[in-house]
Amino acid sequence: MRTNLLILSLLVLFTTNMHSQSSAWFSSSSEAKAYAQKNNVPILLVFAGSDWCKPCMMLKAEILHSKEFEQYYPSQFALLYLDFPMQSKNKLSPELTKQNELLAEKYNKSGFFPNMVLIDVQGKILGTLTYKHQTPEVFINECKSLIEKTKIKE
């Protein structure tokens, strides 16, 4: 009985966690844009190399998948995760690869990874964020500050 309760609890926790990760986390630019328009929020483009870029892996593990960030971001922006994997086992679909390359040409000309760019639904750059091995709380405060600055400009 105790084992069944533990398994059920873990299943509920896992399902809830997966839901929170997927609520505003996208790999498709059209889906991210639709979410942003519907919720009147900007889009955070996250350029990452999931299988070769150590800082990208750390950003994802320490910030993007942190409980604090997962609770914060869905009401603040759509997160568009633009992956550039190197290993063939992680290869993206041709459509996703093309989408990511086109967005990188426009918003990540320097080729810096990880790179985070906040844009509005029309594609106008509102600002950038940098991962500096900070805590989720510090990163969230940087997000809040950037979003506040964009509201002042409007």
Located regions from the model:
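Thiol-based oxidoreductase modules, predominantly thioredoxin-like and allied folds used
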Residues: 23-26, 69-98
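Typically the conserved alpha-helix immediately C-terminal to a functionally engaged Cys/Sec
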Residues: 56-72
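A short beta-strand-turn-helix
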Residues: 26-43, 73
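Non-catalytic, surface beta->alpha helical segment in thiol-disulfide oxidoreductase systems
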Residues: 62-64, 102-106, 110-152
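Hydrophobic beta-strand anchors of alpha/beta hydrolase catalytic cores
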Residues: 44-45, 79, 116
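Bacterial Sec-dependent N-terminal signal peptides
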Residues: 1-23
